Design a protein with these regions (language model features):
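Long, contiguous binding/interaction regions
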Residues: 2-349
Protein backbone atom coordinates (compact mmCIF):
# COMPACT_ATOMS: atom_id res chain seq x y z
CA UNK A 1 0.00 0.00 0.00
CA UNK A 2 1.46 3.36 -1.03
CA UNK A 3 1.33 6.54 1.04
CA UNK A 4 -1.34 9.07 -0.09
CA UNK A 5 -0.12 12.15 -1.95
CA UNK A 6 -2.09 14.49 0.36
CA UNK A 7 -1.94 14.19 4.15
CA UNK A 8 -3.51 16.30 6.89
CA UNK A 9 -3.01 15.82 10.60
CA UNK A 10 -5.85 16.60 13.00
CA UNK A 11 -5.33 16.69 16.77
CA UNK A 12 -8.68 17.13 18.56
CA UNK A 13 -8.53 17.65 22.33
CA UNK A 14 -11.45 16.20 24.30
CA UNK A 15 -12.30 17.18 27.89
CA UNK A 16 -12.30 13.63 29.23
CA UNK A 17 -9.21 11.88 30.54
CA UNK A 18 -10.49 9.24 32.96
CA UNK A 19 -13.20 7.17 31.30
CA UNK A 20 -11.54 4.81 28.81
CA UNK A 21 -14.90 3.62 27.50
CA UNK A 22 -15.92 7.14 26.50
CA UNK A 23 -12.61 7.72 24.71
CA UNK A 24 -12.92 4.35 22.99
CA UNK A 25 -16.32 5.40 21.64
CA UNK A 26 -15.07 8.84 20.58
CA UNK A 27 -12.10 7.38 18.67
CA UNK A 28 -14.00 4.52 17.05
CA UNK A 29 -14.72 6.51 13.85
CA UNK A 30 -10.96 6.92 13.37
CA UNK A 31 -10.35 3.20 13.78
CA UNK A 32 -13.13 2.43 11.29
CA UNK A 33 -12.24 5.07 8.70
CA UNK A 34 -10.68 4.36 5.33
CA UNK A 35 -7.78 6.65 4.50
CA UNK A 36 -7.25 7.81 8.10
CA UNK A 37 -4.77 6.43 10.63
CA UNK A 38 -5.08 6.78 14.40
CA UNK A 39 -1.53 7.64 15.46
CA UNK A 40 -1.95 8.41 19.14
CA UNK A 41 -4.46 8.60 21.99
CA UNK A 42 -2.97 10.43 24.98
CA UNK A 43 -5.23 10.31 28.05
CA UNK A 44 -4.33 12.50 31.03
CA UNK A 45 -6.18 11.81 34.26
CA UNK A 46 -5.03 14.91 36.16
CA UNK A 47 -5.72 17.14 33.16
CA UNK A 48 -8.95 15.19 32.56
CA UNK A 49 -8.20 15.60 28.88
CA UNK A 50 -7.39 13.35 25.93
CA UNK A 51 -5.37 14.39 22.90
CA UNK A 52 -6.10 12.32 19.79
CA UNK A 53 -3.81 12.38 16.76
CA UNK A 54 -5.07 11.24 13.37
CA UNK A 55 -3.62 11.66 9.90
CA UNK A 56 -4.98 10.95 6.46
CA UNK A 57 -6.46 12.30 3.28
CA UNK A 58 -8.08 15.71 3.88
CA UNK A 59 -11.70 14.86 3.08
CA UNK A 60 -11.60 11.65 5.10
CA UNK A 61 -9.99 13.41 8.06
CA UNK A 62 -12.69 16.10 8.01
CA UNK A 63 -15.50 13.55 7.91
CA UNK A 64 -13.89 11.47 10.65
CA UNK A 65 -13.28 14.29 13.12
CA UNK A 66 -16.88 15.47 12.66
CA UNK A 67 -18.02 11.94 13.55
CA UNK A 68 -15.76 11.98 16.63
CA UNK A 69 -17.14 15.37 17.63
CA UNK A 70 -20.71 14.12 17.33
CA UNK A 71 -20.02 11.29 19.77
CA UNK A 72 -18.02 13.48 22.18
CA UNK A 73 -20.79 16.06 22.45
CA UNK A 74 -23.21 13.29 23.35
CA UNK A 75 -21.00 11.69 26.01
CA UNK A 76 -19.12 14.59 27.67
CA UNK A 77 -20.98 17.03 29.92
CA UNK A 78 -18.91 20.07 30.86
CA UNK A 79 -21.09 20.72 33.90
CA UNK A 80 -19.34 17.76 35.53
CA UNK A 81 -15.82 18.53 34.31
CA UNK A 82 -12.81 19.52 36.37
CA UNK A 83 -9.13 19.23 35.52
CA UNK A 84 -5.75 20.90 35.74
CA UNK A 85 -5.60 21.94 32.07
CA UNK A 86 -7.22 25.11 30.73
CA UNK A 87 -10.38 24.28 28.76
CA UNK A 88 -13.64 25.82 27.56
CA UNK A 89 -15.52 22.96 25.94
CA UNK A 90 -16.19 19.25 25.64
CA UNK A 91 -14.43 19.32 22.28
CA UNK A 92 -11.94 21.95 23.34
CA UNK A 93 -9.79 22.52 20.27
CA UNK A 94 -9.58 20.95 16.79
CA UNK A 95 -6.48 21.97 14.81
CA UNK A 96 -5.81 20.98 11.19
CA UNK A 97 -2.14 20.69 10.23
CA UNK A 98 -0.68 20.29 6.72
CA UNK A 99 1.69 17.32 6.50
CA UNK A 100 2.16 16.46 2.83
CA UNK A 101 0.82 17.90 -0.42
CA UNK A 102 -1.55 20.27 1.40
CA UNK A 103 -1.23 24.01 2.00
CA UNK A 104 -2.05 25.94 5.14
CA UNK A 105 -4.82 27.73 3.20
CA UNK A 106 -6.42 24.39 2.39
CA UNK A 107 -6.34 23.56 6.09
CA UNK A 108 -8.00 26.91 6.83
CA UNK A 109 -10.86 25.86 4.56
CA UNK A 110 -11.08 22.48 6.31
CA UNK A 111 -11.39 24.21 9.69
CA UNK A 112 -14.10 26.52 8.36
CA UNK A 113 -16.05 23.57 6.95
CA UNK A 114 -15.69 21.76 10.26
CA UNK A 115 -16.95 24.80 12.16
CA UNK A 116 -19.87 25.30 9.79
CA UNK A 117 -20.97 21.67 9.95
CA UNK A 118 -20.70 21.21 13.71
CA UNK A 119 -22.21 24.58 14.64
CA UNK A 120 -25.16 23.98 12.34
CA UNK A 121 -25.84 20.48 13.64
CA UNK A 122 -25.41 21.17 17.37
CA UNK A 123 -25.75 24.93 17.79
CA UNK A 124 -22.21 24.88 19.19
CA UNK A 125 -20.34 28.21 19.47
CA UNK A 126 -17.05 27.90 17.56
CA UNK A 127 -14.08 30.24 17.42
CA UNK A 128 -11.51 30.28 14.61
CA UNK A 129 -7.89 30.60 15.75
CA UNK A 130 -4.30 30.48 14.47
CA UNK A 131 -4.11 30.84 10.66
CA UNK A 132 -7.90 30.62 10.45
CA UNK A 133 -8.47 33.59 12.79
CA UNK A 134 -10.51 36.44 11.36
CA UNK A 135 -9.38 39.02 13.92
CA UNK A 136 -6.05 39.61 15.69
CA UNK A 137 -7.29 38.87 19.21
CA UNK A 138 -8.22 35.34 18.17
CA UNK A 139 -4.92 34.19 16.73
CA UNK A 140 -3.66 32.83 20.07
CA UNK A 141 -5.62 29.98 21.62
CA UNK A 142 -4.89 31.12 25.22
CA UNK A 143 -6.59 34.45 24.46
CA UNK A 144 -9.73 32.71 23.23
CA UNK A 145 -9.72 30.29 26.15
CA UNK A 146 -8.99 32.92 28.83
CA UNK A 147 -11.66 32.70 31.52
CA UNK A 148 -12.14 29.03 30.61
CA UNK A 149 -15.47 27.23 30.79
CA UNK A 150 -16.45 28.93 34.04
CA UNK A 151 -16.17 32.40 32.48
CA UNK A 152 -17.61 31.49 29.10
CA UNK A 153 -21.21 32.52 29.80
CA UNK A 154 -20.17 36.11 30.49
CA UNK A 155 -17.46 36.23 27.82
CA UNK A 156 -19.61 34.98 24.95
CA UNK A 157 -22.19 37.69 25.66
CA UNK A 158 -19.64 40.40 24.83
CA UNK A 159 -19.84 41.68 21.23
CA UNK A 160 -16.08 41.33 20.77
CA UNK A 161 -16.28 37.64 21.70
CA UNK A 162 -19.22 36.63 19.55
CA UNK A 163 -18.28 33.25 18.00
CA UNK A 164 -17.27 32.96 14.36
CA UNK A 165 -19.79 30.14 13.88
CA UNK A 166 -22.83 29.18 15.90
CA UNK A 167 -24.93 31.20 18.34
CA UNK A 168 -23.54 33.71 20.82
CA UNK A 169 -25.09 31.85 23.71
CA UNK A 170 -23.73 29.66 26.49
CA UNK A 171 -24.26 25.92 26.09
CA UNK A 172 -23.68 24.52 29.61
CA UNK A 173 -23.23 20.91 28.56
CA UNK A 174 -20.97 21.58 25.56
CA UNK A 175 -19.16 24.85 26.25
CA UNK A 176 -17.40 26.11 23.11
CA UNK A 177 -14.83 24.88 20.61
CA UNK A 178 -11.84 26.45 18.88
CA UNK A 179 -10.72 25.22 15.49
CA UNK A 180 -8.14 26.42 13.02
CA UNK A 181 -5.22 25.68 10.76
CA UNK A 182 -1.70 25.81 12.12
CA UNK A 183 1.77 24.54 11.46
CA UNK A 184 3.12 21.57 13.38
CA UNK A 185 3.23 22.31 17.10
CA UNK A 186 5.12 20.23 19.63
CA UNK A 187 3.47 19.81 23.04
CA UNK A 188 6.28 19.03 25.45
CA UNK A 189 6.51 19.06 29.23
CA UNK A 190 9.43 18.85 31.65
CA UNK A 191 8.91 17.55 35.20
CA UNK A 192 10.63 19.02 38.26
CA UNK A 193 11.49 17.48 41.62
CA UNK A 194 8.99 19.66 43.50
CA UNK A 195 5.28 19.74 44.26
CA UNK A 196 5.23 23.54 44.15
CA UNK A 197 3.45 24.63 40.97
CA UNK A 198 4.43 28.26 41.52
CA UNK A 199 8.09 27.35 41.04
CA UNK A 200 7.28 25.66 37.74
CA UNK A 201 5.32 28.71 36.68
CA UNK A 202 8.19 31.03 37.59
CA UNK A 203 10.49 29.01 35.31
CA UNK A 204 7.84 29.04 32.56
CA UNK A 205 7.61 32.84 32.81
CA UNK A 206 11.35 33.18 32.24
CA UNK A 207 11.41 31.12 29.05
CA UNK A 208 8.07 31.77 27.31
CA UNK A 209 7.55 34.47 24.70
CA UNK A 210 5.05 36.43 26.79
CA UNK A 211 7.49 36.50 29.70
CA UNK A 212 6.32 37.93 33.01
CA UNK A 213 4.68 41.04 34.42
CA UNK A 214 6.96 43.91 35.42
CA UNK A 215 6.24 44.92 39.03
CA UNK A 216 7.27 47.82 41.23
CA UNK A 217 8.93 47.68 44.66
CA UNK A 218 5.54 46.99 46.26
CA UNK A 219 4.85 44.06 44.00
CA UNK A 220 2.24 45.94 41.97
CA UNK A 221 2.18 45.57 38.20
CA UNK A 222 3.39 48.57 36.21
CA UNK A 223 1.03 49.98 33.56
CA UNK A 224 2.51 51.35 30.35
CA UNK A 225 1.44 54.40 28.35
CA UNK A 226 -0.90 52.23 26.28
CA UNK A 227 -2.81 51.27 29.41
CA UNK A 228 -1.54 47.69 29.36
CA UNK A 229 0.59 46.00 31.99
CA UNK A 230 4.30 45.99 31.12
CA UNK A 231 5.87 42.61 30.53
CA UNK A 232 9.46 41.38 30.47
CA UNK A 233 9.88 39.04 27.47
CA UNK A 234 11.14 35.52 28.05
CA UNK A 235 14.06 33.73 26.43
CA UNK A 236 12.26 32.14 23.48
CA UNK A 237 10.01 33.94 20.99
CA UNK A 238 8.18 30.87 19.69
CA UNK A 239 7.22 29.29 23.00
CA UNK A 240 4.12 29.12 25.16
CA UNK A 241 4.68 27.81 28.69
CA UNK A 242 2.97 27.53 32.07
CA UNK A 243 3.39 25.69 35.33
CA UNK A 244 1.12 22.68 35.82
CA UNK A 245 0.94 19.64 38.06
CA UNK A 246 1.90 16.31 36.46
CA UNK A 247 0.50 14.55 39.50
CA UNK A 248 -0.11 15.49 43.13
CA UNK A 249 3.60 15.44 43.97
CA UNK A 250 5.23 16.61 40.73
CA UNK A 251 5.14 20.06 39.16
CA UNK A 252 6.02 20.48 35.50
CA UNK A 253 6.72 23.16 32.95
CA UNK A 254 4.11 22.56 30.24
CA UNK A 255 4.98 23.96 26.80
CA UNK A 256 3.89 24.41 23.22
CA UNK A 257 6.80 24.83 20.80
CA UNK A 258 5.30 26.92 18.00
CA UNK A 259 8.37 26.84 15.76
CA UNK A 260 10.57 23.87 16.63
CA UNK A 261 13.08 24.79 13.94
CA UNK A 262 13.76 28.07 15.73
CA UNK A 263 13.28 26.85 19.29
CA UNK A 264 14.20 23.19 19.64
CA UNK A 265 13.32 20.58 22.24
CA UNK A 266 16.89 20.60 23.51
CA UNK A 267 16.89 24.41 23.73
CA UNK A 268 13.95 24.54 26.13
CA UNK A 269 15.11 21.48 28.07
CA UNK A 270 18.51 22.99 28.79
CA UNK A 271 16.99 26.37 29.66
CA UNK A 272 14.67 24.70 32.18
CA UNK A 273 17.59 22.77 33.65
CA UNK A 274 19.52 25.99 34.14
CA UNK A 275 16.60 27.92 35.63
CA UNK A 276 15.72 24.99 37.91
CA UNK A 277 19.27 24.79 39.24
CA UNK A 278 19.14 28.47 40.19
CA UNK A 279 16.35 27.70 42.67
CA UNK A 280 17.72 24.38 43.88
CA UNK A 281 15.62 22.10 41.68
CA UNK A 282 16.30 19.45 39.06
CA UNK A 283 14.59 18.54 35.81
CA UNK A 284 13.65 14.88 36.18
CA UNK A 285 11.74 13.81 33.07
CA UNK A 286 10.51 14.93 29.67
CA UNK A 287 7.06 14.18 28.26
CA UNK A 288 5.77 14.53 24.72
CA UNK A 289 2.01 14.91 24.29
CA UNK A 290 1.03 13.63 20.88
CA UNK A 291 3.55 13.13 18.11
CA UNK A 292 6.77 14.85 17.14
CA UNK A 293 8.42 15.49 13.74
CA UNK A 294 11.48 13.39 13.00
CA UNK A 295 13.57 16.50 12.27
CA UNK A 296 12.94 17.81 15.80
CA UNK A 297 14.26 14.58 17.30
CA UNK A 298 17.26 14.52 14.97
CA UNK A 299 18.14 18.08 15.92
CA UNK A 300 18.04 17.18 19.61
CA UNK A 301 19.98 14.00 18.85
CA UNK A 302 22.77 15.99 17.23
CA UNK A 303 22.87 18.31 20.25
CA UNK A 304 23.20 15.44 22.73
CA UNK A 305 25.59 13.37 20.60
CA UNK A 306 29.04 13.31 22.19
CA UNK A 307 31.08 11.76 19.41
CA UNK A 308 31.84 12.69 15.82
CA UNK A 309 29.18 13.69 13.31
CA UNK A 310 26.47 11.06 13.26
CA UNK A 311 24.14 10.33 10.35
CA UNK A 312 22.35 7.21 11.62
CA UNK A 313 18.81 8.35 12.42
CA UNK A 314 18.22 5.58 14.94
CA UNK A 315 21.29 6.54 16.95
CA UNK A 316 20.35 10.22 16.87
CA UNK A 317 16.83 9.46 18.04
CA UNK A 318 18.19 7.37 20.92
CA UNK A 319 20.45 10.28 21.87
CA UNK A 320 17.44 12.60 21.85
CA UNK A 321 15.36 10.24 23.99
CA UNK A 322 18.12 10.10 26.59
CA UNK A 323 18.97 13.81 26.55
CA UNK A 324 15.34 14.89 26.72
CA UNK A 325 14.65 12.32 29.48
CA UNK A 326 11.73 10.89 27.50
CA UNK A 327 12.36 7.42 28.93
CA UNK A 328 12.02 8.45 32.58
CA UNK A 329 8.23 8.30 32.92
CA UNK A 330 7.61 5.28 30.70
CA UNK A 331 9.04 3.49 27.71
CA UNK A 332 9.24 5.87 24.76
CA UNK A 333 8.36 4.11 21.50
CA UNK A 334 9.82 6.18 18.65
CA UNK A 335 8.05 4.14 15.96
CA UNK A 336 4.69 5.27 17.30
CA UNK A 337 5.68 8.73 18.58
CA UNK A 338 7.52 10.21 15.58
CA UNK A 339 5.12 11.41 12.89
CA UNK A 340 6.94 10.11 9.81
CA UNK A 341 7.68 6.74 11.38
CA UNK A 342 4.14 6.34 12.72
CA UNK A 343 2.66 7.11 9.30
CA UNK A 344 4.99 4.59 7.67
CA UNK A 345 3.99 1.95 10.22
CA UNK A 346 0.32 2.64 9.52
CA UNK A 347 0.79 2.38 5.76
CA UNK A 348 2.73 -0.86 6.09
CA UNK A 349 0.09 -2.39 8.34
Amino acid sequence: MSMPTSLVECVPNFSEGNDKDIIEQITRPVRDANGVSLLDVDMGADFNRTVVTMVGEPEEVLKTVIDCTRIALELIDMRNHSGEHARMGAVDVVPFIPIKGVTIDECVKLSERYASSVSEEFGLPIFLYADSARMPQRVRLPDIRRGEYEGLEDKISLPEWSPDFGPAEFKPNMGATATGARSILIAYNVNLDTDDKSKANSIAAKIRASGSLVKDANGEKIIGEDGKALRKPGIFQSLQAAGWMYDSSTAQVSMNLLNYEKTGLHDVTEAIRQEAEKIGLNATAGELVGLVPLSAMLSAGHYYHDGEDESDENILVENAISGLMLDQLSDFEPRSCIIEWAIAEGVES
